[in-house]
Amino acid sequence: MTETEAVVDQIDLNGALPEKKKKPKKSVAFDDEVDAVSKDGPEASSAGATDEDDSERKSSAKDLTTPVTEGEVDELKDMFSSMKKKKKSKKSSASAEEQTEDITTESGELDFSSMKKKKKKKKSADLSAFEKELEASSTGDATSDLSKQTFDSENMGEHAWLKSDRDYYYPELLNRFFTLLRTNNPELAGEKRKYTIVPPSVHREGKKTIFANISDISKRMHRSLDHVIQFLFAELGTSGSVDGSSRLIIKGRFQQKQIENVLRRYIVEYVTCKTCKSPDTILTKENRIFFMTCEACGSVRSVQAIKTGYQAQIGKRKHVS
């Protein structure tokens, strides 16, 4: 009969647990003890080791045979319940932001909430400055009204300063100076006189175009009728003739706009002066070259001869047999 069986018999008979034996404490072996052990030999050390193994086996057997009470079971449950995984509770974004703000303020770190863009407030207008601007604008309007009144009165032929003892205004004197200059010396006023001619009267007769007032236009330009007709035929690319009532009959159908454009080119090239833009010029021919002399400025320049360009086919083509 082994020792463990004897212990179990004691538990069953008496119903009480046997007293636990205390484990022998291990002592640290110093140099003297090591020498003593070495003197005793390997037999003493092996005997001590076997005694320790037997005591450990007895204590483990006693632990297995001891009954577990309800209190100990509850303690074990509490211990294992604390070992379960805890579910992470989702924190609301608002609470998290509040915590972060508290942490930043307490720890003394930067507060990034102040980095948000703030809406600009409209500046309240200064009433005094606004009133000053109004006064300045009103004075400016008054001066402009005065100048307008003076100019209007002068345009009507009335001089406001003649009927009163007030001081003269600069715009009044300036306007008076220019009016006197224009009346006494019109050529020094700097104004360009517009050169106007009678519009050409053009109408159709079948496949022909009749230019009725060509003689009047040539007299107004101070140019010969033959020279004007020659330029017209060269530009329009056609031919024609003059009837008994000094009307030009042009072969082909042409509109009034086309003849007006041709006359404008003739005036620019053979009538107006290139220096002073005056229409008072004379066209003369010397050694088969045309010269244009200006009566206003006295300049003389040569003019190109009229060249016949493209000739339009008007009549029927002759069939060569």
UniProtKB/Swiss-Prot annotation:
Its main location: cytoplasm. Keywords: Cytoplasm, Initiation factor, Metal-binding, Phosphoprotein, Protein biosynthesis, Zinc, Zinc-finger. The keyword Zinc applies. It comes from the Eukaryota. The modification Phosphoserine is found at S45, S137, S138. GO terms for cellular component: cytosol; eukaryotic translation initiation factor 2 complex; multi-eIF complex. One of its GO terms (biological process) is formation of translation preinitiation complex. Gene3D superfamilies: 3.30.30.170. One of its GO terms (molecular function) is translation initiation factor binding. Transmembrane segments: none annotated. A zinc finger (C4-type) spans 273-297. Residues 1-117 are annotated as: Disordered. The modification Phosphothreonine is found at T139. It is found in: Cytoplasm, Cytosol. Component of the eIF2 complex that functions in the early steps of protein synthesis by forming a ternary complex with GTP and initiator tRNA. This complex binds to a 40S ribosomal subunit, followed by mRNA binding to form a 43S pre-initiation complex (43S PIC). Junction of the 60S ribosomal subunit to form the 80S initiation complex is preceded by hydrolysis of the GTP bound to eIF2 and release of an eIF2-GDP binary complex. In order for eIF2 to recycle and catalyze another round of initiation, the GDP bound to eIF2 must exchange with GTP by way of a reaction catalyzed by eIF2B. Eukaryotic translation initiation factor 2 eIF2 is a heterotrimeric complex composed of an alpha, a beta and a gamma subunit. Belongs to the eIF-2-beta/eIF-5 family. This is Probable eukaryotic translation initiation factor 2 subunit beta.
